[in-house]
Amino acid sequence: PFGWRIVGTLFGVAMLPLMYALAKRVTKSSKWAGLATFLFAVDGMHFVQTRIATIDVYGVFFIMAMCLCMLKYWQMNFYADGLKRTFRSLGACGILFGFAIASKWIGFYAGAGLAVAFFTTLYKRYKEYKEAKQYLAAEGLEEEKKEFCTHIVQTFPRYTIQTLLFCVGFFLIIPAIIYLLSYLPYLLCAEKPYTLADVWGVQTYMFNYHSQLTATHPFQSPWYQWPLMIRPIYYYAGANLPEGMMRSIAAFGNPAVWWTGFASVIACLFMLA
């Protein structure tokens, strides 16, 4: 039905400015950000998945949004930008993380990436702290640089503890509350009054279902074939159509995007190595 699909479609459209913002923040170029957004817009997988009334689109939307906030935090520095300003990006990231896991559990897996980015950022602040102590031990340091190094040495322990405590609230407590609130329609169901024990039962059922799933389907393919789209998913084939007419829905990416993109990722890995 139209009502089931229109909201997911709108979220799919909203992903385009998110992609632009992500690419712009990474590349610092409007040209490359526009190209990334165009390639995303013409991808068949994105087009289909946002129009078939599944919940994946909502999870991916919030994952993209939380990654944008974490990327902004990655590019900030609480020594220079101030602790409160960095908290804005971190807080927004944590709330979006809650929305992501409330939409689908894939938000949990994306949260692992957030953790890596966050602790890497803290490690960079720690390295700056050590370097500042070394600079202060040297002689002949410029007064302005000496003041900033002193600021780093004095604030690192306090800022780090405050940041970690802030993250406990915004990445553990608040997401848990958001996740629980997403079950309000379930708990308030008029036909049968459900309890928190029932909510926990749903969690164990979902985990057991996915961890023990052995069922197959004709269009399944192993994960290592996905980047090459060797066997796309065939969702729908029309029936009872006029002679000479056919209708089908298949989910697969744009080969011009996926194949060249996959090769580009491999090339980037070699360049980093």
Language-model regions: role of each:
Residues K24-T27, M66-L90, F119-Y129:
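Membrane-interface transmembrane helices that cradle and orient dolichyl/undecaprenyl
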Residues A36-A41, V48, L68, F97, ...:
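Short helix- or helix-capping micro-motifs
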Residues R88, E131-Y135, E147-I173:
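Membrane-interfacial entry segments at the cytosolic side of transmembrane helices
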